Amino acid sequence: MSTSIKEKVSLVSLGCPKNLVDAEVMLGYLAKEKYEVTTDEREADIIIVNTCSFIKEAKQESIDTILDLADRKHDARCRLLIVTGCLPQRYQEELVKELPEVDIFVGTGDYPRIAEIIAEKEGMSEQLRYTGDPNFLYDEDLPRLQSSPYYTAYLKIAEGCSNCCSYCVIPSLRGAFRSRPLDKLLKEARELVARGVKEINLIAQDITGYGKDLAGGASLEGLIKELAALDGLQWIRLLYAYPDGISDSLIQLIRDEDKVCKYLDIPLQHVSDPVLKRMNRRSSEAEIRSLIAKLRGEIPGIALRTSLIVGFPGETDEDFKKLLHFVEETRFDRLGVFCYSREEGTPSAEMPDQVSERVKRERYKKLMRTQARVSFKHNRSLVDTEELVLIEGYSEETELLLKGRSSKQAPDIDGQVYVTSGNAQIGDIVKLRITDSSDYDLIGEIVP
């Protein structure tokens, strides 16, 4: 920077935890270059919006956020508005025309250059855009400013995706699947634990693919074993495990290793074989049912989370009924449902028999109502049991109630546990007796 006065930068990260790690890398670079990071956009000289464009709703949220923050250039101190991530990587030409309020666009391959790019903008009035090949792979030697609470962190073990589902734009935005070297992951994990992290959440587009592209026999199981040996680390959580990549050895490791949360996030998307085939998914209904039975048989009490898509092209009433019955029978602990989003450039966008938006919404509501009943019954079954809970703070309604998450609840996406009695500090992992429940949350007392 040319001035000794520190400029303040604020970053808003949208979308998934993988995006959050990218945002933390950019903040790390900026802090290293003597920018001051603030969480208050009103105080910021530079505002960065790290975007998602996976589905229609994500794109709309990104655009709405950009336009809202663009107003800060008129009524606050902001001098630069920067848009980064998947949205400019995918729509750079359109964004330049439609968003003159934005000063710089940066795609998914140029995060490490963020400070350099800002410097290049000095004295220039025209918009700048940097959207090269999406080949960036995070390295533990890169600066990263952790924005999550001190006791929990995400560890991105790979970038990109090579699964090529027919509805998905991720391979074009993030490139092919590429794993980070094992030694580099372990170095970063040690640094996180040294800073007080108790929970590490492993993330990638598909964590089961880890190591298959590396020489030397690296594997997800090997990584987990190395992480479990770290003193001070208490929870290891596995997010985004494709069903066809879940091996018997991984199941046994989840069962036998105390530090691995008895929790697994498996994006199934559907269960009807004709729909799965059109989605270009590799698992069949029979294989999915067999996997779930094996997981529950080998790991009693495991919490299973999945995501499902309704309204995929060609999804018939019978296909949806099969999906609805599957959710009723399987009783997932957590469930995310998405209406199919017709994304240009994907094979499914050109498929015949597109489902109307009205039908998509009806199916979405039916599936969510069904899951609410499943979740309520499941949570009621936990009353009078004991759970380990990570204390995260106070209830939004009253500071008389602590709140936290059990080992079977992931950050941000799952429910919470509210603590009605007992003392604990933020970041403590304590034993709770569950005394009550709602559709998605639990209530309990700390066991003395």
Curated annotation (Swiss-Prot):
Entry's Gene Ontology cellular component terms: cytosol
SUPFAM superfamilies assigned: Radical SAM enzymes
Binding site for [4Fe-4S] cluster 2: C161, C165, C168
Residue span(s) of domain Radical SAM core: 147-377
Keywords noted in UniProt: 4Fe-4S, Cytoplasm, Iron, Iron-sulfur, Metal-binding, S-adenosyl-L-methionine, Transferase
Task of the protein: Catalyzes the methylthiolation of an aspartic acid residue of ribosomal protein uS12.
Cofactor: [4Fe-4S] cluster
Primary subcellular site in the record, as a coarse category: cytoplasm
One Gene Ontology biological process: tRNA modification
GO molecular function: 4 iron, 4 sulfur cluster binding; aspartic acid methylthiotransferase activity; metal ion binding; protein methylthiotransferase activity
Enzyme class: transferase
Protein name, entry field: Ribosomal protein uS12 methylthiotransferase RimO
Positions of the TRAM domain: 380-448
Cofactor info, note text: Binds 2 [4Fe-4S] clusters. One cluster is coordinated with 3 cysteines and an exchangeable S-adenosyl-L-methionine.
Annotated binding of [4Fe-4S] cluster 1, by residue: C16, C52, C86
Species of origin: Geotalea uraniireducens (strain Rf4) (Geobacter uraniireducens)
Reactions catalysed: L-aspartate(89)-[ribosomal protein uS12]-hydrogen + (sulfur carrier)-SH + AH2 + 2 S-adenosyl-L-methionine = 3-methylsulfanyl-L-aspartate(89)-[ribosomal protein uS12]-hydrogen + (sulfur carrier)-H + 5'-deoxyadenosine + L-methionine + A + S-adenosyl-L-homocysteine + 2 H(+)
Subcellular location: Cytoplasm
